Amino acid sequence: MAPIITVVGSFAVGLTIRTPQVPIFGQTLIGSDFDMGPGGKGSNQAVATARLGANSYFVGLIGEDKLGEIATDLYQREGVDTSYLRTTTQMATGAGLIILNSKGENFII
């Protein structure tokens, strides 16, 4: 019998771009290797436990928006139970802008 794992946490879409250096206010840099993908510590754990064969439940809140659709598509594809996932029009789904420099250092907004 598969274990039941319930994860309470967040979902956010990560928008990642590489630049030679971290920009300062007012500066424009050319970036490369843009990527967009699902994330959030709780969400990542729920997906990982489902991939390992657990009955995985995710408890969280997402917006009724395009980024929220990324979450629900992900959970359906990965077999994460969303019985306790709630959606709202009162806030947007989380997003993080991740900037990586040539040294591998990053910051997230």
Label for each model-derived stretch:
Residues 15, 94, 106-108:
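Short, well-ordered, mixed-charge alpha-helical segments that flank or form enzyme active sites
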Residues 87-88, 98-109:
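Conserved phosphate-binding/catalytic loop of the ribokinase/pfkB sugar-kinase fold
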Residues 1-61, 66-70, 76-77:
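Glycine-rich phosphate/adenosyl-contacting loop at the front of the ribokinase-like
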Residues 74-91:
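A glycine-rich helix N-cap at a beta->alpha junction
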Residues 55, 81, 105:
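Residue-level detector of anion-binding/catalytic polar loops
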